């Protein structure tokens, strides 16, 4: 069960999607993400190209492996204090 304090604002369940749809849906969801919000991406494989895109566009992410072998990737905007100058 997900903790109520960590309920994401948006969820993209990409387990049944084929590339490049998971990446496209994730980018669309990030555009719609409210300030300070979080996006949960559920995906059956590590989306390596997405990680660089997230970091380069000011997001941080946490990856956890699900019991079914898929990945939960929690994405949020990086805090300004941690930004690179």
Protein language model annotation of sequence segments:
Residues 1-4, 15-18, 25, 74-76:
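Small-residue-biased structural context
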Residues 1-7, 80-85:
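Short, low-complexity, intrinsically disordered N-terminal peptides in bacterial proteins
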Residues 61-85:
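C-terminal edge-of-domain segments
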